[in-house]
C-alpha cells in the first residue's frame, strides 16, 4: 500500500547543470550513510537546496509501520520505536505501508524541543505514562535531515544533530524521565561562507565538505535559466523528459548499496590514506575512516569491485579539506594542499 501525498514538484536531479562535487558527495552519502553527512558551502542562489531536494526523488520508497511517527522499519528491530517493538513481541498485527524516503527541513529558528521532541512531565508523573511528543529527529529517521544556513544555527543544536546522526539514536531527558528512539538519518547542512564558518570541532564531524560556486560560463548559465523556465512552465512535462535518466540513476544507487559490503580496499591503500592524514596533521581518525568509506561507495556506484588510487583521489579532498588546521581568518582550503599531499604520497 502506498501513502499518497500532495507534494510540490521537485526539479529532477539528473537535469541539474554542473556542481559535480556536491552531487557526488550526496550520492555517496546515500549509498553509505555511515560516511557521516555532508556540509555544503557556497554562494547564495547556487541551487544548494534545489539539489538536496532533488536527491530525495532518486531514493527508493521505504516500508514503514502505519501511523508510527518514527518511520519504524518493519523488518529491523534496531530501527523500531518501543511501541512497535512491544507489538511485535506480543505478535500483534501491524499494518505496513510504503512511503517516500522522508526529507525533513530544520528551520533556522528551531528549538531543541522542536528538534528532539518533548516529554509531558505532568502526564508522566500523574498517570505514570511516558507522554512523548516526537520532534523533527523522529520524522527524519531513515531519511534525510536538511539544515540550510547551518552555520547560523546555535552550536548546541548542531551538536545535538551531529550526536544523533552519529549514534542513530535520539535521547530526551527531562526531570528524571528518559525517552530514546531511533534517529538514523543523513545530515546535510548548507551555508554561505560569507556568513561565517562552523566551529572546527563541529565541522570535523561532518563526513564530507563540498564547495559550490556560481557558474561563470555564459552558455551554462543560459542553460540553467532555460531549464528553470521550462520546469516552471510545465513541471510534469519537464520531469517526464528526465524520467529514464532518473530511473537509471536510482537503479545505480540501489545496486551500489547492495554491492557496498563486498568492495575491497587493499591494506597498502589504507596505509597511504593514513599517511596523507598524518602529513596534513589531521586530528583524530575520522578523516582516515571517511576517505576509505567514500572511496568504497564510489567503487560500488561505478559497479566495480576494488578501490584504486584514482578513486581515493576523487574523494579525498571532499573528506579532508575541512579537517585541516588553519588560521581562524583563512577560508577552508579549496583542496590544493590535500591534492598535493596525495600526489606526493602516491607518486601520482
Swiss-Prot record:
Coiled-coil positions: none
Gene3D superfamilies: Magnesium chelatase subunit I, C-Terminal domain, P-loop containing nucleotide triphosphate hydrolases
Catalyzed reactions per annotation: protoporphyrin IX + Mg(2+) + ATP + H2O = Mg-protoporphyrin IX + ADP + phosphate + 3 H(+)
InterPro entries for the chain: AAA+_ATPase, CHLI-like, ChlI/MoxR_AAA_lid, Mg_chelatase_ATPase-isu, Mg_chelatse_chII-like_cat_dom, P-loop_NTPase
This protein's record includes keyword Ligase: yes
SMART domains membership: AAA
Entry superkingdom: Eukaryota
GO molecular function list: ATP binding; ATP hydrolysis activity; magnesium chelatase activity
The enzyme's E.C. designation: 6.6.1.1
Keywords: ATP-binding, Chlorophyll biosynthesis, Chloroplast, Ligase, Nucleotide-binding, Photosynthesis, Plastid
One GO term (biological process): chlorophyll biosynthetic process
Family, as annotated: Belongs to the Mg-chelatase subunits D/I family.
NCBIfam families listed in its UniProt record: BchI-ChlI (TIGR02030)
Protein name per UniProt: Magnesium-chelatase subunit ChlI
The species this protein was found in: Euglena gracilis
Amino acid at each position: 500500500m502506498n501513502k499518497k501525498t500532495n507534494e510540490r514538484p521537485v526539479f529532477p536531479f539528473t537535469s541539474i547543470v554542473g556542481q559535480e562535487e556536491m552531487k557526488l558527495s550526496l550520492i555517496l552519502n546515500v549509498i553509505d550513510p555511515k560516511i557521516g553527512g555532508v556540509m555544503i558551502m557556497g554562494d547564495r542562489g547556487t541551487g544548494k537546496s534545489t539539489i538536496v531536494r532533488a536527491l530525495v526523488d532518486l531514493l527508493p520508497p521505504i516500508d514503514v509501520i502505519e501511523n508510527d511517527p518514527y518511520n519504524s522499519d518493519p523488518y529491523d528491530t534496531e530501527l523500531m520505536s518501543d511501541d512497535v517493538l512491544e507489538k511485535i513481541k506480543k505478535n500483534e498485527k501491524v499494518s505496513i505501508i510504503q512511503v517516500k524516503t522522508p526529507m525533513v527541513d530544520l528551520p533556522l529558528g528551531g528549538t531543541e524541543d522542536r528538534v528532539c521532541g518533548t516529554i509531558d512531565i505532568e502526564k508522566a508523573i500523574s498517570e505514570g505514562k511516558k507522554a512523548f511528543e516526537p520532534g523533527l529527529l523522529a520524522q527524519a529517521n531513515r531519511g534525510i535531515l536538511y539544515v540550510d544556513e547551518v552555520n547560523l544555527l546555535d552550536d548546541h543544536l548542531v551538536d545535538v544533530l551531529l550526536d544523533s546522526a552519529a549514534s542513530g539514536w535520539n535521547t530526551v531527558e527531562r526531570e528524571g524521565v528518559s525517552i530514546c528512539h531511533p534517529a538514523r538519518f543523513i545530515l546535510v547542512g548548507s551555508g554561505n561562507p560569507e556568513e561565517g564558518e562552523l566551529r572546527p570541532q563541529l565541522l570535523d564531524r561532518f563526513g564530507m565538505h563540498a564547495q559550490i560556486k556560481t557558474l561563470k560560463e555564459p552558455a551554462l548559465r543560459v542553460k540553467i535559466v532555460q531549464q528553470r523556465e521550462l520546469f516552471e512552465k510545465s513541471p510534469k512535462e519537464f520531469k517526464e523528459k528526465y524520467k529514464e535518466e532518473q530511473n537509471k540513476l536510482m537503479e545505480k544507487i540501489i545496486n551500489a548499496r547492495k554491492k557496498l559490503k563486498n568492495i575491497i580496499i587493499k591494506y597498502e591503500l589504507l596505509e597511504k590514506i593514513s599517511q596523507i592524514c598524518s602529513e596534513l596533521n589531521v586530528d583524530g581518525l575520522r578523516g582516515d575512516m571517511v576517505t576509505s568509506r567514500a572511496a568504497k561507495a564510489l567503487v560500488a556506484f561505478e559497479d566495480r569491485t576494488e578501490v584504486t588510487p584514482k578513486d581515493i583521489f576523487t574523494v579525498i579532498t571532499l573528506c579532508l579539506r575541512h579537517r585541516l588546521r588553519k588560521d581562524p581568518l583563512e577560508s577552508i582550503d579549496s583542496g590544493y594542499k590535500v591534492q598535493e599531499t596525495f600526489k606526493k604520497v602516491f607518486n601520482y
